[in-house]
């Protein structure tokens, strides 16, 4: 059943807790058989309003990648008593991440992390987001499609979609794609193109979409982490229309345009 929330808009469908939950505190944990999972957590909020962010790393990288790529996101999340989780390994990689760094089974791990954080750390069911770089950017985009019943928004840094995916029956998550110039953000695929593929898929769904071409190279969007955090804050689950539907807020990165 939908999780009731005090705010308006549609309610996300949160998975049930199954089995033991981890302790949400800064450090490295093993959960559901996966080691090396990094957790950045703020002091538990007094009421259920905190954010939760998945960070998915790139090929050949590790779960600690977020500290450099998404520093402003981590700071924002933890300052509000929220949780950022970054998996290191996979239950079994597949094409959802492009290079089999992560795979569909990891979505089940994500389901439990979300369910546990809502129950145990006062995370707001409407504030579940995903970001990541390269293979992780592809996976963040696809996770949000395949878990649109509760994911509020995705903001991949050189990510998008290499091939179409079907959204779940419910949910219209927002999207902010960050990428380099065409021909300059290429590792096997052109991430400006995969970003455009995702932009079009989400737009067709009815989502609010922002496209940010920073003009640089692969995973060069770390400087937009502050803008990603603003985007997440403004787009909890079910936000429609976007408060930014007519214009991006003052001071937002000029590389970004409403799609």
Regions found by a protein language model. Name each.
Residues 149-229:
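The feature captures the conserved acid-bearing segment of alpha/beta-hydrolase catalytic domains
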Residues 1-52, 83, 102-105, 131-150, ...:
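A domain-start/cap signature at the N-terminus of enzymes
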Residues 108-115, 119, 145, 196, ...:
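Solvent-exposed, polar/charged alpha-helical surfaces in well-ordered, non-transmembrane soluble domains
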Residues 71-79, 143-144, 165-167, 199-201:
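Mature extracellular/periplasmic domains of secretome proteins
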Residues 56-63, 118-121, 133, 140, ...:
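Cell-envelope and extracellular/periplasmic
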Residues 18-24, 30-40, 48-127:
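Serine-hydrolase catalytic machinery in alpha/beta-hydrolase-like enzymes
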């Amino acid at each position: 059943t939908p999780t009731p929330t005090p705010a308006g808009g549609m309610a996300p469908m949160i998975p049930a807790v199954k089995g033991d939950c981890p302790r949400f505190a800064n450090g490295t944990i093993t959960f559901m058989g996966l080691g090396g999972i990094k957790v950045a957590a703020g002091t538990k909020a007094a009421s259920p309003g905190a954010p939760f962010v998945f960070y998915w790393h790139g090929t050949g990288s590790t779960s600690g990648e977020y500290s450099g790529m998404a520093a402003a996101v981590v700071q924002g999340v933890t300052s509000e008593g929220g949780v950022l989780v970054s998996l290191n390994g996979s239950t079994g990689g597949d094409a959802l991440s492009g290079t089999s760094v992560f795979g569909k089974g990891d979505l089940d791990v994500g389901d439990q992390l979300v369910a546990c954080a809502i129950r145990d750390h006062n995370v707001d069911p409407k504030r579940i987001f995903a970001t990541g770089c390269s293979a992780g950017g592809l996976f963040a985009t696809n996770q949000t499609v395949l878990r649109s019943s509760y994911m509020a928004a995705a903001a991949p840094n050189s990510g998008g979609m290499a091939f179409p995916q079907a959204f779940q029956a419910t949910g219209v998550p927002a999207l902010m794609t960050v990428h380099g110039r065409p021909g300059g953000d290429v590792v096997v695929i052109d991430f400006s193109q995969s970003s455009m593929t995702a932009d079009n898929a989400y737009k067709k769904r009815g989502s609010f979409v922002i496209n940010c071409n920073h003009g640089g190279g692969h995973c060069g969007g770390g400087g937009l982490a502050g803008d990603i955090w603003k985007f997440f804050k403004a787009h909890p689950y079910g936000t429609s229309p976007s408060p930014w539907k007519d214009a991006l807020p003052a001071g937002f990165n000029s590389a970004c345009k409403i799609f």
